[in-house]
Amino acid sequence: MTAQMFTIALLLSLSAIAAAGTIKTAPARTPSTQDDASFPPDGAPVKRFDAFTTGFGHSKRNFDEIDRSGFGFAKKNFDEIDRSGFGFNKRNFDEIDRSGFGFNKRNFDEIDRSGFGFNKRNFDEIDRSGFGFNKRNFDEIDRSGFGFNKRNFDEIDRSGFGFNKRNFDEIDRSGFGFNKRNFDEIDRSGFGFVKRVYVPRYIANLYKRNFDEIDRSGFGFNKRNFDEIDRTGFGFHKRDYDVFPDKRNFDEIDRSGFGFVRRNVE
């Protein structure tokens, strides 16, 4: 009986010690910071962003995607463009700004479709805006209806205004007289003239020599040092062919409608 009471007393003592906290258990696992970030108290996962997605203006540098916010801000060295409707400066980017505000652009591949006039330099495509401006060293042409100068471009100006052209491959289809030099195609004038290589033409009994196409322009003008011929309606002298034996040793002819003297021929 005494032993049973002693055992019961020992068990009660151990229970009291355990309740008092003298026997330490292993600490419970606390959630990590990463788990808190990935799973907030409501249990929904949090989406992580590398770039800003707020709707407020801020600066961004050296990132691949763009800010679609509707606020103006500065951007440098990024690949895509800002679609916001506010004016801002852009440098060295590949695509264009579709906003309707005027701004300056430099060294970009595509063009600004906005309806505001601005300067453009060293770009491949053209400005479709209806404002006059200067263009240099570009491949395509300006479809605007304003007169301007063009140099060193491949295609032609379809505008109806007279202007000067130099060193281009195609011709001016406008109905105005102008000078042409060093171009490959021809003038489609409807006037009679003499042509080399003795190819008679309709009733005018024209002579032709070493040319492929003709000038469709209806105005007389001067031509020098070009591969094809002038279709002006004026007579002139040609060297080195049988009809004019006093002329000699020249490759192409002068399409001007006036007589002239040539020197330093063999």
Curated annotation (Swiss-Prot):
GO terms, molecular function: neuropeptide hormone activity
Set out the biological process GO terms recorded for this chain's protein: neuropeptide signaling pathway
Gene3D superfamilies per UniProt: E3 ubiquitin-protein ligase SopA
Establish whether keyword Signal is in the entry.
yes
Q: Which residues form the signal peptide?
A: 1-20
Task: Point out the propeptide residues.
Answer: 21-46, 240-246, 264-266
Which cellular components does GO assign to this protein?
extracellular region
User: Got any disulfides in this one, which pairs?
Assistant: none
Location comes to: Secreted
What InterPro entries does the annotation carry? Answer: ORCKA/B
Principal location listed in the UniProt entry: secreted
Instruction: Cite the entry's keywords alphabetically.
Output: Cleavage on pair of basic residues, Neuropeptide, Secreted, Signal
Quote the function comment for this protein: Myotropic peptides that enhance both the frequency and amplitude of spontaneous hindgut contractions.
Q: Report the sequence similarity comment from the record.
A: Belongs to the orcokinin family.
Q: What is this protein called?
A: Orcokinin peptides type B
Q: Which organism is it from?
A: Procambarus clarkii (Red swamp crayfish)
